[in-house]
Amino acid sequence: TVSPLPRYTRPREESVVAPREEIIPFAQSDAAIDQSPLSAGSRALLRGLLRVGSTRMFPGGGAGIEYGGLLKTAARPDYIAAHVVEAADHLRECKTDLLLVPGMSGYPVGAMYALAANTPALLLKKSKLGDANPNAYPAGAFVIPSYTGEGDVVMHADPAAVKDIVATIVARKLAEQTDQPVIELDLRVAGADDIIDKATMSQAVSESAVVIGEEAIGHCLAQHRLETADRRPANIHVSVVAWVTPLIKSYNRPREHLWQSFKLQPFAGLDLYTVHLDPPAIGVTGVGCVGFAANGAGSS
């Protein structure tokens, strides 16, 4: 059975061999970070990543960064609190109404962003793709390969959560427009994830956000008309206005992809221009290529 859901593919990436002498040893990383133009939030984030993380091969995506103890399996205010505040400031500057976060791995930091920015967030849950009833998934669902090698999975929002959150937003916007001849229902959505790799997931979530938002607002407007005598014409517009993430792999050109597709520049704590497996190291824009504290540290 061919699923009617939108399907996205992730290209595999390989690591780049780097001469050992070009890598700043972990023992010298503090000095390099202090001399960098990174913000306070990005400096603390990088120190935490180098201390608890490493690099390794992932079954579903090739060479990548293992950062579970920083962003997925622990909450470390000493390393990420300042970055969360900076990202929340960006969300507020973009006048974000709603945040979408894909999968459980992105939700810890996504929830932190949401609370810091005082913005409601929706988790796009990951489910195994089943052939029994491919039409059973809610609006905005899509299929994408799992980064951990589990095969194709379906990402979708909780319809009950969507309904309540969007209803609250729409009610506020309607209350602000009681004297207007035309109702303008604009929903400004942002995305958040623990990392932006090739922007495949970012594109999928952004396109999903428009579908989710338009359907939910349409239902809210119909309910409003049923309950009131309001028959004013209405315009519905859902736009993706921001992406926030601790990490972005700039060597995969995700910034260019998001600009071309959505005319937005993602906000990232650390811009990574290369990832090395042997020895484990990452190239960080503004700092250089820096080694991790321990080989194979922080696996999950």
Show which residues each predicted segment covers:
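Active-site-facing substrate-recognition patch
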Residues: V16-T96, H156
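Short glycine-rich phosphate-binding loop at a beta-alpha junction
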Residues: T96-G103, V244
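Structural motif
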Residues: L98, R188-A190, A242
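Short, ordered loop/turn segments at secondary-structure junctions
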Residues: M104, K126-K128, I248, D271
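Short, glycine/charge-rich flexible loops or terminal/linker lids adjacent to PRPP-binding catalytic cores
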Residues: N118-V189, A199-Q203, G283-G286
